[in-house]
Amino acid sequence: GFADEEGVRYQTAYLGSKVIAGCFEASDLKRKDADGIAMAEAIRKFGGDPMKLQSARLNPKKLLGYVEAHIEQGPVLQKKNLAAGVVTAIAGQSRFKIIFTGHAGHAGTTPMDMRQDALCAAAELVLAVEKYARKTTDLVATVGQIKAEPGASNVIPGEVNLTLDVRHQKDSVRRAACFALQKIAQKIAGARKAKISWQ
C-alpha cells in the first residue's frame, strides 16, 4: 500500500501504489476531504510536494521484486490458528457515493402508500448488496456510511447518502458486480419512485 492504502480520507484507494506505478491521476489532487482540505494541501502539510507525484514512478526494469510485511486486517488467520500467511492476490477496490432522493414528508400524516421514503430505498439496497456479495465467491461489498436527511424523527427521509465499497481479486468479477449492483439500485429507485445518483 505504501501510503493511504484504504483511501478513506479522499476516497482514493492505493494512493502510494498508484504513484510508484505511474497510475496517479493529477486530478485527484483537487479532491477534498470532509473538512474541505484538498489533497494537494494535505500532502504539503505532511512535508510532501504534490507536484512531484507524477514523476515519482519507479522504473520496473530496475526492480528485482518487492516484499511488504503486513498485518492481516481480517480474522482468517486467527480462525485457522495460523501465525502467518502468504498473499496470493490483492483485491481491487471500487468505491461509489450513492444518493437516493425521495420526498420528505410528515411521518404522522403521510399515508404509507403515498410515501417516497429515500431511506427505505437505501435500506433495500443495503440488503441487496449483502445478498449479492454472499453469493459471489471471494467478493466483499460494504455500505460503510449512510446519512438520512433531514434526519428528524418525525420526518420521512427525503434524501439518503451512502457509500459502497466493492472488492475482489479479479477485476472482471469486481466490475461485473459493480455493474449488477448499480442496476439493482436503479431498479429499487424506480420501484420506490425515487431518484438515484451513482458516482
Task: Describe the residue ranges of each PLM region.
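Metal-dependent amide/peptide-bond hydrolase catalytic core
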Residues: 97, 108, 119-199
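Acidic/histidine-rich catalytic neighborhood of metal-dependent amide-processing enzymes
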Residues: 1-84, 127-155, 162-165, 175
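Short, contiguous, pocket-lining structural segments
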Residues: 31, 35, 86-92, 110-121, ...
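Acidic-glycine-rich active-site phosphate/pyrophosphate-binding loop
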Residues: 89-102
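Solvent-exposed residues in well-ordered beta-strands and their adjoining turns
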Residues: 72, 101-103, 167-169
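Short small-residue beta-strand/loop micro-motif enriched in glycine and branched aliphatics
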Residues: 104-110
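Feature marks short, surface-exposed loop/turn motifs that line or immediately flank catalytic pockets
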Residues: 3-7, 104, 170
